[in-house]
Regions:
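Short, hydrophobic beta-strand segments
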Residues: 25-27, 89-96, 126-130
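Flexible, glycine/charged-enriched surface loops at secondary-structure junctions
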Residues: 59-69, 116-127, 155-164
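A short glycine-/small-residue-rich loop at the edge of a beta-strand within enzyme catalytic domains
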Residues: 38-41, 45, 96, 100-104, ...
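An extended, acidic, His-containing surface patch that forms the Zn2+-binding/catalytic region
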Residues: 127-175
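Short amphipathic alpha-helices in soluble, non-transmembrane regions
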Residues: 105-114
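Divalent metal-coordination and catalytic microenvironments
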Residues: 33, 47, 92, 145, ...
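Histidine/acidic-residue-rich, glycine-tolerant segments that coordinate divalent metal ions
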Residues: 1-84, 168-169
């Protein structure tokens, strides 16, 4: 998770690693022949709108200085070139540096997904798997660890990590 030289020890006060949550969205529409699109509810199109709406939400409703990432890793829909898709599956992760931002994104994601599905006549299922919390290093403990490491290997072999990473870390339960 880092590109720091071997033999160096980094420390970080405050937020060090992001929270991570998984999302699984299923859009249920009504498939049909591509020549009769008015008789269908195009789940693929609705799914695409969900992805672009979430990306727009992230860039316009989240403070740019408040690190947060919405990533779609899987988008599955359709089975033939001449058939309007009856379902779409969208899966990915949300990563944040603040608990308040995490809650805000998850709440609004549900509103966006439900709203778009309702607007286009589809139904949906949203599953959120809450993963790791934000790793926030205690200032007093970090200062103590920093001094111990500096005494052990020398101050010149230690450095303060400049910014938190957007990866998640199991160590968040201990920090």
């Amino acid at each position: 998770f880092n590109n720091y030289p071997c033999g160096m020890v980094g420390y970080k006060f405050g937020a060090k690693a992001s929270s991570t949550d998984e999302f699984y969205i299923k859009v249920i529409g009504k498939g049909g022949h591509a020549g009769l699109p008015h008789q269908t509810i195009d789940a693929l199109s609705i799914g695409a709108k969900i992805v672009t709406a979430m990306e727009s939400f992230m860039s316009r409703r989240i403070d740019p200085f408040d690190s947060a990432v919405f990533s779609v890793g899987i988008f599955e829909s359709g089975s033939a070139i001449n058939i309007v898709a009856d379902s779409a599956k969208i899966s990915g992760t949300i990563r944040c540096q603040k608990d308040e931002t995490r809650a805000y994104i998850l709440k609004n994601m549900e509103q966006i997904v439900n709203g778009l599905c309702q607007a286009y006549g589809a139904t949906c299922k949203i599953d959120i798997i809450h993963g790791l919390p934000v790793q926030v290093n205690d200032a007093e403990t970090t200062e103590y660890a920093k001094k111990v490491v500096e005494q052990a290997i020398g101050k010149e072999k230690t450095f303060e990590i400049p910014q938190p990473m957007m990866g998640a870390e199991d160590f968040s339960y201990y920090a």
